[in-house]
């Protein structure tokens, strides 16, 4: 059994035997989600193995950035372990404890995670934590409408275009729920990156110069914009919609496809949020572009604060929290300590390929694993919000009929100025 009793000499998950940190209380700051509530409900297991007590603070996502930032500013060790969005990591890196030496000592291999998840918990070559909540992209589609019109699940973006045109003309609803809107969250880059990377282009080159203006990069961008401006397959409001608007559009039956995070699945057949029933909602891995699929992924790592006075005890907690068996059980068991929990989020590759995990979750992890085979993250630099906003604005303007190439070249010039000022060249 993977759960050894504390009387055994050898504990699971590379935990130290003999309870060297018994009596320590760790303060954990985490985002509000059933996945992490379930971890808290299981923490007696950790306490029985180590004698370490856990004190959890769960903060809603909208308030999380401010809360985590204040932990870094206070610098008083009030929280031993913090949970944050990967793109905030670079600005926190100076007060997060690198874990590479511990990983090596305890024989833990970060290759247990998909590449994008692994990268999301790193900064400048150092590992700062474990990606314990992470989201791949999937293409959700209306199974009933695809069946009705003899359409197959889209394997590439040409399939998306032809299915979108068929459904728009026959059903009078949007083929694809598009989100080209720009509101400061840079969500209109999420699908653009799939096109850019699959074309062999990138955001920056090895010199950190903007690389999206190569001929391949510009063609990929035009093809992404063309979904709306040329092919006309998008639902209403495409040029101003952000991701949430697109999710609502799909859930209300006003568009037949949406490329979005896997966590959206349960909401698409939740009667409080959606007009659709479960048998109308299907999903597939992200479509290929130019014969290749490269997807964007996002994660929420856990890291130890450099200001913690209990770093070794905190590392014991991190080992327990990130162990593959817990990851797996947490997506299978629907009740934890008497509380109903529904969670499909796993981050270990082994969990995504696990038969029981897939059986409990309509095989969504299997589709996610396909999306994640080739995957990447947004650039991990402190200047990314500024550069990303320039790109998001250019893409929004392009979707309204602006000159794609010119807009992207202008964004590149402005971005280069920002990065020059920051000392990259």
Where does each model-flagged region fall?
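Glycine-centered hinge/linker elements that transmit conformational signals in sensory
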Residues: 164-166, 207-238, 282, 286
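Conserved C-terminal helix/tail region of periplasmic/extracytoplasmic solute-binding proteins
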Residues: 8-12, 19-25, 53-54, 147, ...
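Short, solvent-exposed loop/beta-turn-alpha elements that line the ligand-binding surface or hinge
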Residues: 16-23, 100-115, 180-183, 199-219, ...
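Hinge/lid segment of periplasmic solute-binding proteins
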Residues: 7-20, 85-138, 152, 161, ...
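Extracytoplasmic "Venus flytrap"/periplasmic binding protein-like
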Residues: 42-115, 122, 144-155, 248-249, ...
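C-terminal lobe and pocket-closing loops
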Residues: 13, 20, 263-278, 289-393
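Short, well-ordered beta-strand elements
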Residues: 22-33, 52-57, 80-81, 176, ...
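Extracytoplasmic/periplasmic solute-binding protein
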Residues: 124-132, 137, 161-210, 255
């Amino acid at each position: 059994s993977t759960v050894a009793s504390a009387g055994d000499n050898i504990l699971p998950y590379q935990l130290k035997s003999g309870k060297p940190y018994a009596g320590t209380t760790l303060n954990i700051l985490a985002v509000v989600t059933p996945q992490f509530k379930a971890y808290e409900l299981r923490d007696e297991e950790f306490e029985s193995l180590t004698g370490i007590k856990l004190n959890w603070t769960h903060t809603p996502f909208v308030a999380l950035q401010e809360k985590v930032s204040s932990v870094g500013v206070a610098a008083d060790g009030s929280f031993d372990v913090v949970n944050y969005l990967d793109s905030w990591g670079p600005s926190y890196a100076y007060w997060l404890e690198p874990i590479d030496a511990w990983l090596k000592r305890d024989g833990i291999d970060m290759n247990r995670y998909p590449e994008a998840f692994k990268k999301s918990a790193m900064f400048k070559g150092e590992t700062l934590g474990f990606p314990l909540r992470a989201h791949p992209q999937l293409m959700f589609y209306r199974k009933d409408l695809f069946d009705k019109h003899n359409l197959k699940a889209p394997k590439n973006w040409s399939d998306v275009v032809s299915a979108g045109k068929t459904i728009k003309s026959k059903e009078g609803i949007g083929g694809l729920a598009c989100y080209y809107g720009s509101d400061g969250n840079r969500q209109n880059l999420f699908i653009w990156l799939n096109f850019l990377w699959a074309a062999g282009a990138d955001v920056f080159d090895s010199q950190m110069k903007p690389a999206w203006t190569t001929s391949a990069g510009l063609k990929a961008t035009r093809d992404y914009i063309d979904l709306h401006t040329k092919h006309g397959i998008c639902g209403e409001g495409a040029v101003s919609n952000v991701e949430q608007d697109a999710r609502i559009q799909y859930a209300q039956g006003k568009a037949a496809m949406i490329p979005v995070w896997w966590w959206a699945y349960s909401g698409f057949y939740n009667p409080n949020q959606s007009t659709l029933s479960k048998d109308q909602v299907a999903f597939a891995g992200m479509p290929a572009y130019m014969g290749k699929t490269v997807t964007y992924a996002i994660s929420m790592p856990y890291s130890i604060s450099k200001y913690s006075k209990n770093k070794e005890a905190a590392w014991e907690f991190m080992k327990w929290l990130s162990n593959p068996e817990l990851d797996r059980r947490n997506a299978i068991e629907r009740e934890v300590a008497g509380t109903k929990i529904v969670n499909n989020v796993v981050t270990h590759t082994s969990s995504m390929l696990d038969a029981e995990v897939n059986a409990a979750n309509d095989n969504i992890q299997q589709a996610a694993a396909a999306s994640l085979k080739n995957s990447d993250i947004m650039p991990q630099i402190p200047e990314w919000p500024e550069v990303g906003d320039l790109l998001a604005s250019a893409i929004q303007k392009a979707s309204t009929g602006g000159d794609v190439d010119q807009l992207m070249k202008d964004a590149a010039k402005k971005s280069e100025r920002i990065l020059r000022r920051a000392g990259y060249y």
